[in-house]
């Protein structure tokens, strides 16, 4: 029996994008949903996206933006990111903050390893250039991470595979559609997915709460 996993990442508080992704996921016989982190940051719907993940029993791997919320820290690289992080810190419910605290640092089972950033720094390493020797001594075949917001699937010469499902909430690969992927554990099949959504809904909400 196959086990189909839906892998999402970098939702960043973008409710309209997550809603269409969940709708698309439900068209498939998915056993579980795993979030590679950064539920938080950039867009305002922090409680709504966490509620959806909870409703779908999703596992969340902690991302750097999630850490900023939990530890009440700021992003050292982006003033604009901190503006929305501060908003999210002010509105997130205690229940949802506690859920965020249950996020795991990585998910590893059989020949699969999943993190938010990379395998040196799970939370804040950018895996932009994929080199075979980086993974050579790591005892897994399938490596999943987010953080870069760039969807890709690379088959390496050492029979290992690198997969970034892309970003649900803020793609940075030239395609504005929300990104995620499906993974068939039994046969090792990776299916990269894109789903269109109404970006104007996000822009309107941002204006309503005073961002632009």
Label every PLM stretch briefly.
Residues 3, 77-79, 112-137, 171:
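Active-site-proximal segments of metal-dependent phosphoesterases and phosphodiesterases across multiple
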Residues 117, 128-156, 160-165, 178:
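Anionic-ligand binding region
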Residues 6, 34, 59, 112, ...:
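Hydrophobic "anchor" residues on beta-strands that sit immediately upstream
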Residues 12-17, 41-44, 65-70, 120-122, ...:
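Active-site environment of divalent metal-dependent phosphoester hydrolases
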Residues 6-9, 13-97:
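Core catalytic region of metal-dependent phosphoesterases/phosphodiesterases
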Residues 105-110, 154-158:
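Short acidic-hydrophobic surface loop/beta-edge motif
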């Amino acid at each position: 029996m196959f086990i189909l996993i839906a892998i999402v990442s970098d939702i960043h508080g973008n409710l309209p994008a997550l809603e269409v992704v969940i709708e698309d996921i439900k068209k498939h016989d998915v056993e579980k949903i795993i979030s590679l982190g950064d539920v938080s940051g950039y867009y305002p719907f922090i409680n709504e996206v966490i509620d959806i993940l909870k409703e779908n029993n999703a596992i969340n791997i902690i991302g750097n933006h999630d850490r900023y919320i939990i530890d009440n820290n700021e992003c050292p690289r982006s003033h604009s990111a901190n503006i929305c992080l501060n908003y999210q810190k002010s509105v997130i419910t205690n229940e949802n903050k506690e859920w965020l605290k249950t996020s795991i640092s990585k998910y590893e089972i059989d020949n699969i390893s999943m993190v938010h950033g990379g395998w040196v720094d799970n939370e804040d390493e950018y895996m932009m250039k994929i080199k075979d020797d980086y993974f050579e001594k790591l005892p897994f075949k399938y490596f999943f991470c987010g953080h870069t917001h760039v969807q890709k699937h690379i088959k390496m010469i050492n029979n290992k595979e690198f997969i970034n499902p892309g970003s649900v909430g803020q793609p940075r690969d030239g395609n504005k559609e929300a990104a995620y992927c499906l993974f068939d554990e039994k046969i090792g099949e990776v299916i990269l997915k894109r789903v269109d959504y109404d970006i104007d809904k996000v822009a309107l909400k941002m204006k309503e709460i005073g961002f632009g």
